[in-house]
């Protein structure tokens, strides 16, 4: 008799953990899907759509830090493509302020920021 309630509690705990894990993976999956959708839209030159998708991914609490930095960088490129240089520069500043940013991304962001600055002169 005692074993049945214990099994039931263990089963309930496992089910709760499984449901929590599934929701975590699902939220992360949705975030990465938004990021990829932004990339596809940018490739089709749908910059407004790309900006919306990148913004949705960036706002997600489940976005991995490296993907967030790339989403912000790519959003900056989309802003730059539609000549919203102030917003592009703000995004590039956010990218450059990201701790642990890989050097190649840092260099690309600095170069893009410099091009935007020169274009504004």
Locate each region found by the language model.
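TPR-adjacent "capping" and linker segments in tetratricopeptide-repeat scaffold/adaptor proteins
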Residues: 16-33, 62
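Structural signature of alpha-solenoid helical repeat junctions
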Residues: 29, 67, 104-107
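"A position-specific structural signal for the A-helix of alpha-solenoid helical repeats
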Residues: 36, 74, 111-112
């Amino acid at each position: 008799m005692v074993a049945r309630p214990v099994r039931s509690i263990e089963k309930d705990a496992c089910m709760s953990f499984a449901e929590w894990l599934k929701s975590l993976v699902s939220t992360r999956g949705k975030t990465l899907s938004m990021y990829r959708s932004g990339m596809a839209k940018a490739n089709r030159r749908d910059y407004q759509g790309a900006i919306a998708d990148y913004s949705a991914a960036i706002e997600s609490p489940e976005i991995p830090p490296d993907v967030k930095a790339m989403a912000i960088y790519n959003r900056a490129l989309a802003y730059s493509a539609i000549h919203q240089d102030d917003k592009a520069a703000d995004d590039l500043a956010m990218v450059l302020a990201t701790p642990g940013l890989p050097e190649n991304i840092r260099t690309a962001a600095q170069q893009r920021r410099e091009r935007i600055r020169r274009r504004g002169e």
